[in-house]
Curated annotation (Swiss-Prot):
The name this protein goes by in its record: Late embryogenesis abundant protein B19.1A
GO cellular component terms given for this protein: cytosol
Any Pfam family the entry gives: LEA_5
Keywords: Stress response
Annotated organism of origin: Hordeum vulgare (Barley)
Primary gene name: B19.1A
Length: 93
């Protein structure tokens, strides 16, 4: 049990130095803060998927995956002739 506590304090030290030690915890200034951020981000994505439905959520991901620093996903989709059905982005009623 002591090794678990030691590992936690090591991770907390790294987090306080600015290192991301929890996937999805970017920006947290401590181990606990990073864990809370990661949990909130995960929950936010799940809620959005429930609101839009799996199909709309996937379609939005397709569009976002096409974006770059130079152009938005919508601009690239139009330029390359990729069909993105934005009607699927609407939340379910």
């Amino acid at each position: 049990m002591a090794s678990g506590q030691q590992e936690r304090s090591q991770l907390d030290r790294k987090a306080r130095e600015g290192e991301t030690v929890v996937p999805g915890g970017t920006g947290g200034k401590s181990l606990e803060a990073q864990q809370n951020l990661a949990e909130g981000r995960s929950r936010g994505g799940q809620t959005r998927r429930e609101q839009m439905g799996q199909e709309g959520y996937s379609e939005m991901g397709r569009k976002g995956g096409l974006s770059s620093n130079d152009e938005s996903g919508g601009e690239r989709a139009a330029r390359e002739g990729i069909d993105i059905d934005e009607s699927k982005f609407k939340t379910k009623s």
